């Protein structure tokens, strides 16, 4: 009897050891990972590798942790240990993160843009030397406006045409150094509160051709999240982006065991079984040792499983968990496919070039099919894969590349361009030319930017080509002289009235009785100050001293402050900036080709075939024509 008890005990110990040494995920294609615990890898009764098969340093690979002590001070010790541990146990290591507006070295704040860029380059180069074969990288973290966009983003190109050029640059830099790594954009509140902003950001950098391979949803917002809301948001994001997804920082922060279990049981299968989900990383697992209140997201407490952990062990042994598909079989990236149009906004009627960057890790490309709006346009068989498309309709056009390898495997990538109508342009060269009330646009000299009106009737900069887009309200202005004003002190100055594009009466933004007895009817399209200057009187920017400087452009000085306008902020500068006042076909579109200063010699198709004389414009069918070298739209 005593011998039987001993044998039974040995059997139990053996069974326990076997259970403990088995990682929770038995799926060969997607991982269930975790992070370090207060700088330690193994923590608690079970070793890290006995539970998880992917690791992310909680802090050890953040720039501040590595180089926060000074430009010449590098501390790679913690990250080295984690990287080596992952290689020892043959599972993925994720570098978290290269570019983030939090936990970066604060000495960066004191550098010029040029030196900031040099520091970023050195940071990435050094990380590349240390970890040349890293499998995954959070290239940019939490850049949604209001989160933590990098304060040093101007060093990477600033907002630019996409609004996120600096992020595109960061991904290009990462891809140059780690072409085989899975490059990820990572952010929070993606399932609640910031879903649309997340989609907008990732869509714009994807469409700009950034070499982004996946998006990371941190998922801290899932505590208390309604299941329907979660499912709908996850589907909405995927339908918009059509890219691999990582659940990158999952936790359910609650002291209540039943609540934590409920959300684990509801949410984990949804994300894990989605074939576009490449893996799930929990953001800590030891109770009291996570970033949440009292560490209450931990699923092992005092060495024992909380109910959520017990369930997680059981779920990971099910066939559904074991057989769930992944966009990265074997947890590695086979295909790098990116679609890069020459610009996100292109003129109607002009050919736009599209570069399809395609590279396989082990396979061979047979051909690349290029689609526009789901219609096959070209089949490309040789690199470089360059396509061309001439949009003939205004609006958004969806681009898609489908790469087929010699074994028949297909890989897809989306992008898009927006086509606009280019009405042509003629810059005015004196105030006399704009005193007759004709509409004009205001563009910044030397910049591809134009003034426009936001929803709050304030001004800012938009892409210059949008000034030619009649569908966007608020790009056109009229100049109104105050020569007949009862206030003799302002008779040599001007009001700027902003027009609506449907020819509705332009009105004054202000209250009745203000603006030197000008009529007002409430909220309307009227340019007074710029951005947050509500023009209820002269000091708030209602009246401008406008001068034309030969060969340079127009200057705008607010007569209340005596300071000049430069940008989308108030007029606050001692020195003038220069602007073009230019005609762009009128507020209601082009009716006849009168934007040129000399008589057109004829009207041609886009293919160069002459179809009419200049005075026969009205006989032509609607379309896009070349008139004196410019594209003109006839409606």
Labelled PLM ranges:
Residues 50-68, 77-192, 254-256:
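Substrate-binding cleft and catalytic face of glycoside hydrolase catalytic domains
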Residues 67, 126, 138, 142-160, ...:
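Aromatic-rich peripheral "rim/lid" segments of glycoside hydrolase catalytic domains that contact
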Residues 75-89, 160-183, 193-259, 268-272, ...:
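Glycoside hydrolase catalytic-domain groove-lining segments
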Residues 329-425:
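Long, low-complexity serine/threonine/glycine- and acidic-rich segments characteristic of extracellular
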Residues 367-372, 589-635:
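C-terminal outer-membrane/trafficking sorting elements
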Residues 423-586:
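Lectin-like carbohydrate-binding module/patch detector with strong preference for beta-trefoil
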């Amino acid at each position: 009897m005593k011998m039987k008890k001993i044998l039974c005990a040995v059997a139990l110990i053996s069974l326990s050891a076997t259970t403990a040494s088995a990682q929770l995920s038995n799926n060969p294609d997607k991982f269930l990972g975790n992070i370090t615990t207060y700088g330690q890898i193994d923590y608690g009764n079970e070793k890290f590798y006995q539970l998880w098969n992917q690791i992310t340093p909680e802090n050890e690979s953040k720039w501040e942790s590595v180089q926060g002590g000074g430009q010449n001070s590098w501390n790679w010790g913690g990250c080295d240990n984690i990287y080596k541990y992952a290689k020892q146990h043959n599972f993925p290591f994720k570098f978290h993160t290269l570019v983030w507006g939090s936990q970066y070295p604060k000495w960066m704040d004191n550098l010029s843009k040029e030196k900031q860029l040099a520091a970023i380059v050195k940071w990435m180069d050094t990380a590349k030397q240390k970890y040349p074969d890293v499998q995954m990288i959070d290239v940019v973290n939490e850049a949604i406006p209001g989160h933590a966009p990098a304060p040093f983003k101007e060093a990477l190109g600033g907002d630019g045409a996409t609004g996120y050029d600096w992020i595109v640059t960061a991904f290009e830099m990462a891809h140059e150094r780690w072409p085989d790594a899975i490059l990820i954009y990572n952010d929070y509140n993606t399932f609640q509160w910031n879903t649309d902003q997340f989609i907008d950001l990732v869509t714009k950098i994807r469409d700009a051709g950034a070499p982004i391979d996946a998006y990371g949803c941190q998922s801290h917002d899932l505590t208390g999240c309604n299941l329907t809301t979660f499912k709908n948001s996850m589907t909405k994001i995927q339908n918009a982006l059509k890219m691999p997804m990582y659940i990158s920082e999952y936790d359910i922060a609650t002291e209540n065991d039943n609540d934590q279990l409920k959300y684990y049981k509801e949410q984990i299968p949804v994300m894990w079984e989605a074939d576009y989900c490449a893996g799930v990383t929990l953001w800590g697992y030891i109770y009291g040792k996570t970033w949440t209140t009292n560490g209450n997201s931990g699923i092992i407490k005092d060495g024992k499983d909380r109910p959520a952990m017990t369930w997680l062990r059981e779920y990971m042994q099910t066939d559904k968990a074991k057989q769930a598909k992944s966009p990265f079989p074997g947890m590695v990236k086979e295909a790098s496919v990116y679609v890069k149009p020459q610009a996100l906004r292109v003129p109607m009627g002009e050919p736009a070039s599209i570069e399809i960057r395609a590279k396989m890790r082990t396979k061979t490309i047979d051909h690349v099919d290029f689609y526009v709006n789901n219609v096959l346009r070209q089949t490309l068989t040789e690199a470089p894969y360059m396509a061309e498309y001439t949009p003939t309709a205004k609006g958004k056009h969806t681009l898609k590349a489908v790469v087929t390898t010699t074994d028949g495997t297909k890989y897809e990538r989306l992008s898009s361009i927006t086509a606009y109508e280019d009405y042509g342009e003629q810059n005015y060269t004196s105030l006399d030319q704009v005193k007759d009330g004709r509409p004009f646009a205001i563009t910044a000299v030397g910049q591809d930017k134009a003034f426009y009106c936001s929803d709050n009737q304030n001004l800012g900069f938009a892409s210059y080509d949008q000034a030619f887009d009649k569908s966007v309200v608020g790009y056109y202005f009229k100049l109104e002289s105050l020569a007949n004003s009862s206030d003799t002190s302002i008779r040599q100055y001007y009001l700027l009235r902003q027009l609506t594009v449907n020819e509705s009466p332009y009105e004054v933004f202000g209250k009745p009785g203000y603006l030197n007895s000008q009529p007002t009817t409430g909220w309307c399209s009227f340019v007074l100050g710029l951005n947050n200057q509500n023009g209820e009187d002269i000091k708030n920017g209602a009246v401008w001293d406008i001068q034309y400087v030969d060969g340079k452009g127009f200057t705008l000085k607010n007569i209340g402050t005596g300071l000049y306008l430069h940008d989308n902020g108030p007029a606050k500068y001692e020195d003038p900036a220069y602007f073009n006042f230019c005609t762009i076909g009128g507020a209601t579109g082009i009716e006849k080709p009168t934007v040129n200063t000399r008589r057109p010699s004829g009207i041609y198709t886009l293919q160069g075939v002459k179809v009419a004389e200049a005075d026969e414009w009205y006989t032509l069918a609607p379309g896009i024509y070349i008139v004196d070298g410019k594209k003109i739209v006839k409606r």
